[in-house]
Amino acid sequence: MEFVATCMPGLADLLSDELGSLGISVTETGRAHVSFSGGVADALKVCLWSRLSERVLLHLATLGVTPDIAPEKLAASQDWLSLVGNNAPVHLHIEHGAEVRGDNRISAKRFIHALPEQFAISREPKGSCCIRARLDLNEAHLWLDLAGEPLHRRGYRLAGGRAPLRETLAAAILWAVGWGKEGRHSALIDPFCGSGTLVIEAALIAAGRAAGAQRQHYGFQQWRGCRRQLWLDAQKEAGESGKRPVPAVSLKGFDSEASTLQLALQNAERAGVRNAIHFERRELGALRRRDFVDNGIVVGNPPWGERLEEKPQAGWLHYALGRILSVRAPGYQALLLGADAEVMDRSGMNLEQQWRLKNGPFNNFIRLYSPRKQTPANVVKVADDSAFNVPEGAQPLLNRLRKNGKHLRRWLEREDIQCYRLYDRDLPEFNVAVDIYADQVLVQEFKAPKTIDPEKAKERRDWAVTAVRAALGVHREQVHLRTREKQKGNQQYQKLDAQGQYRVVREGQSQLLINLQDYLDTGLFLDHRPTRLRIAEEASGKRFLNLFAYTGSATVHAAVGGAKRTVTVDSSKRYLDWAACNLAANGFSTDQHELARADTMRWLDECKEQFDLVFCDPPTFSNNKSRSDFVVEEHHGDLIRKIMRCLEPGGVLYFSCNYRRFQMDESISKWYAVEDISRWSIPEDFRRNEKIHYCYAIRHVEDA
């Protein structure tokens, strides 16, 4: 007898291998099917044991007819009374080939009218004799569907999360990497487990249980060609396999959503593998080296970023996965499902193998990666000597850069700092700031007054760039030049370009995105480094609130430090999107780390939540279309009072301001315990300007 096992398009080679391992005689492998020959027992074996098959079809007829007569001809080609069991309803599915016009429902009605009158027609495959037909231009095909309901319905997953993974696809992912084969892997982690399908299938495969061990209904039960005793024997063998214990392998499923994990626990319970799997609410960024054991693999279905606005976040989440594996589990492999090869390659890992498939409307990839060895970041520092010949006019700046570099060298090494300010308008004739971002240099020229000859200003600018290159020994491509002038309102955030070229730098244990092309500001205020690092130290187990959050770098530090919840508030969509990417680059999602686009003052008026740790760094001045403008000198008292209403007893507010003539509202000091930590909060590389910002730790009086 000739049978066809169907699968997702692109997985037929994997299915063919699986059927061969079951002792099935494969005769043909297509893109979405595998043909095999054998007896009824072989067909039942595939139905019960194959984890990759979607359906098992018995070929009944192929007729050389056109679609206008095909339904009646197909119906007339079979002795239905000898094919269908007594009183069994018939479930029919007819599909049209791509070139066949017309409604397939009309073809189905014509087929049904041509069947013997005693047959009842059912809309449901369960409990029915299932017939499938396909009409092409010059051919018509007829099959008996021995599976009935699709075989991915194992019986344990009654509900899924936001993007549930089909069981057959999960099994194909695992089969691709040889999961369950002796000596291949001793551990499996799914950091995006959702409702648990991948890790549950991994447990069932490791135990050697039949895919259909828990299923009670198949299409072949209503087929006269299947003897009842044959079915009972096959069912008994499959059922007994369902009692096999899961061997001693490490199986872990992590997810950020508690409700989804609850589904995973319920599904694992129904599958009989609950005690074999460790499920935990934890985000990718919270995985530690101890979570990985030798000879393991990470499998997962990370967010694809199918919507355009989600694509950057998905890419940075893949980046985080690659970085985490390279640092914490360099011996692991990663087997990932995705829809965009470019997004998946953002992981930075080495691509070992891939499979292409069609998953409903999506073109998908299964990709096997291995981590790349993590190389230390190259942080540019002042060189002891230089091959550059600088103009005489640039020599004073070169000397000052070398002096500053020598002063900062030991501090930079001791504190392990990648991003710092090397020079800040120390010399009147060089009105620039020089910031180092790992292996890149940002030179910010403060626009010369109109009284200065433009040609002279340009010459000084060129000298500055030459001196920087000579002092640091960098190529021209590593130096980024910007011109700043006195800003009004939100002009400091004005767009310069639209290249979207983000780079990653490290601060403490956090990975932060900077942009040296598109905006005047890079996305990271270097002078707040000590405060951000303190937030990371204090955040464990706390609820963190970040107001006027900009790109959310403080939020990232809180998340990396173990905050149980964070809320990030800013009025700019652009910077909240940036914050989302910052979180993703560290392995955190916006499920547990809320991003709120809102006016901060109004958001505080409506806030009902309490926080243990708050960071607020308001601008000196901010335009607002929906209310009066925000002026920090006038409004900071009201702002702080609103924040303190949301601050839990025992909590602390870190309030910062870069207004040079700032003076704290006296009423704040009367009502709250205010500690001026400005001197502590200004790092060594900014000590030349003690008014770069003011910073205060504010607590409730009873906590002081």
Curated annotation (Swiss-Prot):
It catalyses: guanosine(2445) in 23S rRNA + S-adenosyl-L-methionine = N(2)-methylguanosine(2445) in 23S rRNA + S-adenosyl-L-homocysteine + H(+); guanosine(2069) in 23S rRNA + S-adenosyl-L-methionine = N(2)-methylguanosine(2069) in 23S rRNA + S-adenosyl-L-homocysteine + H(+). PANTHER family: RIBOSOMAL RNA LARGE SUBUNIT METHYLTRANSFERASE K/L, RIBOSOMAL RNA LARGE SUBUNIT METHYLTRANSFERASE K_L. Belongs to the methyltransferase superfamily. RlmKL family. Its EC number is 2.1.1.173, 2.1.1.264. It comes from Alcanivorax borkumensis (strain ATCC 700651 / DSM 11573 / NCIMB 13689 / SK2). Pfam families: Methyltrans_SAM, RlmL_1st, UPF0020. Specifically methylates the guanine in position 2445 (m2G2445) and the guanine in position 2069 (m7G2069) of 23S rRNA. PROSITE patterns: UPF0020 (PS01261). SUPFAM superfamilies: S-adenosyl-L-methionine-dependent methyltransferases. Keywords: Cytoplasm, Methyltransferase, rRNA processing, S-adenosyl-L-methionine, Transferase. It comes from the Bacteria. One of its GO terms (cellular component) is cytoplasm. This is Ribosomal RNA large subunit methyltransferase K/L. One of its GO terms (molecular function) is 23S rRNA (guanine(2445)-N(2))-methyltransferase activity. The keyword Lyase does not apply. It is found in: Cytoplasm.
